[in-house]
Amino acid sequence: LTFLDADGNEIRTFTSEEKGSEPKGDESEAKEHKPKKKEPRVPKEAGTNRFIWDLRYPDAHDTDPPAVLWAGTLRGPLAVPGQYQVRLTVNGQSYTQPFEVKVDPRVTVSQEDLQAQFDLLLKIRDKLSETHDAIMQIRNLRSQAREWQQRAQGSAEGEVIASAAESIIKALTEIEEELIQVKAKEIEDPLN
């Protein structure tokens, strides 16, 4: 089940298939992103089924372990009122239907203001995802540098490799500390 904007650009896709189980692996800091919550599944029983879209665009990416965001959220922005499409794909056959998201009658702001707010929230979400992805890449690279340090122990070039790896680790840590508070306590927002 895919939700699309009026131009046919994909917003979000849901499936009836259960996601595979998380692989058991290295518990180092270089883990892959894990979703904070399970995506709702599309029912697939014969007959009439119901699925409720929360009108949200995809969430921002998180770090692992998850960043504590006291003053914010990773939730994607709500769709603005307007025309959308939904596409149901079953056994290779697709069915598309247009629909309209209407403004709450209690809302007194203009469509332009709602669109400007949405555009800003989308930019913030994308920048937060970019920052969190960079942090995860830094952690992955730092983990690899540490592995090279360990592998090089006892070899002829061991000290040279260990020194180079230490320089890389130090530089990566400095970059990470510019992006996020690595020593933040649970009651502090870690994003710089």
Per-segment meaning from a language model:
Residues 1-192:
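C-terminal low-complexity, glycine/proline- and small-hydrophobic-enriched intrinsically disordered tails
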